[in-house]
């Protein structure tokens, strides 16, 4: 009963029976991807859904963030640099350039989990397919039957998210597998990302995605576009372990800062790292070499403008993430704060600076009402309102229930 504020007779009725309906969580996603480890003590957790509710629990079972690596070199400018390197920063004389390429592949599940919890995510499950050195699609193809069987054993999972799949050329095969093998039970809902291609028209992206996704169980999936420029990683995350020098490069800049003493110090660090010996010729231990790399990184950041610009570019590159994990957090937040009857739309996103591609009203028409009915939900920026999820349709857009 409420607080008594006026005199009178009040009758308080007691419930004769308990609630007949047990309250359950309605938005519990499972994330499938690559992690640093997958251990509960000494027991392997590979291919098994593990229930967590915070990044602290994630770190306990699955380890920390990956350390993506980018190979740097200072070389003569060549005609095919744009095809071979991710970034190129020419010097003032346009003869040499600071060049950067990706070493191996980049694992992103950790960053997606940060986005999920930042946008209202709570209880969820994580399935680790393997470590950071593995290939997502290879492990997915080899273990999907086991993974799907284990997911079906958990009663409270309602959504499926595979945020790393979109980085692969085979992502549409992953999506169609999910829709065919999991969503056929009408219990699971898949959140999908739309592949991005630089310079591509919105209509072409929509058509390509619609062609690849097929026609099976589209009413149990939603797709979101575009990708997001996030703030998951900070400047401090781009350190000497991420930016790795190729010390066998063809040339070395004659000057970094123009200050002879600074340049001498930087070249001294480069020599120590490349030879694994200090100035006196003594062998350096691994920890000592790493410290020299850190000192070199800090000196270059402070004294070489091209290096500082490249570090920012690398950070922005890593912070460009597809939206499915953030949307899983939004689904959870909306269900918990408003109720399952409220659509997960017209909601702001956290840890997001802006959509990677500005979506206009015309673009939204293309995404929202394609001829095939395979609707894609847009994420847009509005003046005075910020970034909003601007759509809540399933991929079965021609359905009356969409």
Residue ranges and their predicted role:
Residues 1-402:
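Surface-exposed assembly/interface segments
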